[in-house]
Amino acid sequence: MIGETVSDSPTSGLFKSILKHEVQKALGCTEPGAVAFAAAIAAQVLKDGGKFSPDNIEKVWVTVCPGVMKNGAAVTLPGTEGQGIGLPLAAALGVLAANPDGLNTLQGVDAKAREQAACLVCQNHVGLSSTEGSEFFIEVKLEMKNGVTSEVQITGGHTHVASVKKNEKDVPWNSISENGNGTSTDVPLSDLSYRERLRKCSFEDLIAMAGELSIKDARYVKLGVDMNLRLAKVGLEMGRPAVASLQKMVIHNVSAPSLETNIKLMVAAATSARMGGADVPAMSSGGSGNQGVDTTLPPYLFGKDKNIPEDRILKSIALAHIINAYCKAFFGDLAPACGCAVSAGLGATAAIAYQINPTLEAVTCAIQNLTAMIAGMLCDGASEGCAAKVVVAADAILWAGCAAGYGDNLSGGAAGIVGKTAEETIKNLNRVIQGMLPLDPEINDVIRMNAGNVHRACFKRPPLSAMAQLSTFEV
């Protein structure tokens, strides 16, 4: 039964830290959302008497790590009626919002803000560059025409505000938050010490942590499931390519209605809705909405179909979030490998195995199985194609988890990068992922060449007033 967490547990309080930092409501792709968040803080710092005029903006400078650059290149932004793309536009919208709300900063963007943001980008008032390092990094510098400046840095995670400055002097971000202009999810960098604790955990500890799920935390886990189910419903109505193709396969008798088909359809719908700019939030996991879909929907839909008790379903989803966070503590926030396969996927497949057989042996086998299947799936940036990747991951998640739960080790044990234990497998996978880090700059170069310098993109169909600027200003 679900109850209160045991107070003397070696992992006491750790799951609450994971929920606070990594399982958050998120509107749209989280990398542009984090850029908008930083930009909104920068604008909030410079608000004078509660007013902020875009006419007084001289320049918005955005610097991000290669992973953020990659994931912000081609994904559609929420609040743009399905037309806005690119990190420069996300930053411009965040500045105009001047109301930092974590990964939901772009909520409520109106037509006027869209038009003003498009003009800022088209008039080259927004600059974008990339760092060489692989660590998660976002910096937004805002310069006004009167010379006043602000600077915000986010490091170590999507809402982890590391530094806020006005005119090159530190400003306590907590003071801004307490005035009602921040978000409950922004935290100082020092609070990331929970990741050190996670790295020291065994999988036995992780399973025990999920088993101690409190009533309050179980409600939050269920809230995340409900949010992602709602998002999937919106995605079904949108009928984007990944969803339409799966439906056509059933119509043409290529696949049949089944639990497997339903899981793939629901994750495709939720993911394609996010990548398509739907103004409906997801509950994220590990700082990613798509990974939130991955960690919640396959285990939940499986459990409901198999009449697994509700408390075990929720504990299994808690385990999925925990394992995703555990993997992130080793791999980093933005790995070159697809997170839906190598971190959230590992959590989700372990959750399914846990529902069938809640033992360390079954969970370990699930980790080994999925690693043997799809550990090498590449992340080439957030886009419509993410829905297809999540479908492939969901298919493997179900197979790997069921096989493990029913006692079948698909890898045959330690082979390739699969280790003898779950911990060893994760460490082996981490070695491979660290070796892949030079790929991100190369992928970004390919994206630029493939899409005609997509990082400068703004609107697929710009507002008329923004179009009028194109004859005067170079884009």
What are these regions (language model features)?
Residues I2-S17, P54-V68, P257-G277, E310-K328, ...:
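Acidic-glycine-rich active-site phosphate/pyrophosphate-binding loop
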Residues G3, S7, S12, A26-T30, ...:
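A structural signal for small-residue-enriched, beta-sheet-centric alpha/beta enzyme cores
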Residues V23-I41, G277-L297, G339-S343:
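Conserved phosphate/anionic-ligand binding catalytic regions in large, soluble enzymes, centered on
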Residues C122-G277, I443-L464, E474:
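Signature of multi-pass transmembrane helix bundles
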